[in-house]
Amino acid sequence: MTRSLKKGPFVADHLLNKIENLNAKEEKKVIITWSRASTIVPAMIGHTIAVHNGREHLPVFITELMIRHKLGEFASTRTFRSHLKKSDKKSRR
């Protein structure tokens, strides 16, 4: 189920305050956050936000196409290790 439009998007207060302060100063710094559930809003365009994936912070550069998505969508939490190959099983018999 999607979020109600009358509530507006969820953005962590500390993250929104940092974005607004940087926009007022016209600075571009990497912002470190653990808030994967925050929605990307137009004020974030052009900033780099380092999103925590459980082990490290991954830098995500915000573009216009990312608006209304969550920050956690762009920082994968799982690593894929390839499946085992079946080449050596016959030689063991």
Swiss-Prot record:
Q: Which Pfam families match?
A: Ribosomal_S19
Q: Which GO terms describe its molecular function?
A: rRNA binding; structural constituent of ribosome
Taxonomy, superkingdom: Eukaryota
Q: Name one GO biological process term.
A: translation
Q: What is its main location?
A: plastid
Q: Which Gene3D superfamilies does this one have? A: 30s Ribosomal Protein S19, Chain A
Subcellular location(s) of the protein: Plastid, Chloroplast
Q: Which GO terms describe its cellular component?
A: chloroplast; mitochondrial small ribosomal subunit
Q: Which InterPro entries match?
A: Ribosomal_uS19, Ribosomal_uS19_bac-type, Ribosomal_uS19_SF
Q: Could you list this entry's UniProt keywords, alphabetically sorted.
A: Chloroplast, Plastid, Ribonucleoprotein, Ribosomal protein, RNA-binding, rRNA-binding
Does the keyword rRNA-binding belong to this entry? yes
Write out the function statement from the record: Protein S19 forms a complex with S13 that binds strongly to the 16S ribosomal RNA.
Q: Which family does it belong to?
A: Belongs to the universal ribosomal protein uS19 family.
**NCBIfam families in the cross-refs:** rpsS_bact (TIGR01050)
- The protein, known as: Small ribosomal subunit protein uS19c
What species is this protein from?
Zygnema circumcarinatum (Green alga)
Q: What is the lineage of its organism?
A: Eukaryota, Viridiplantae, Streptophyta, Zygnematophyceae, Zygnematophycidae
What gene is this protein translated from? rps19
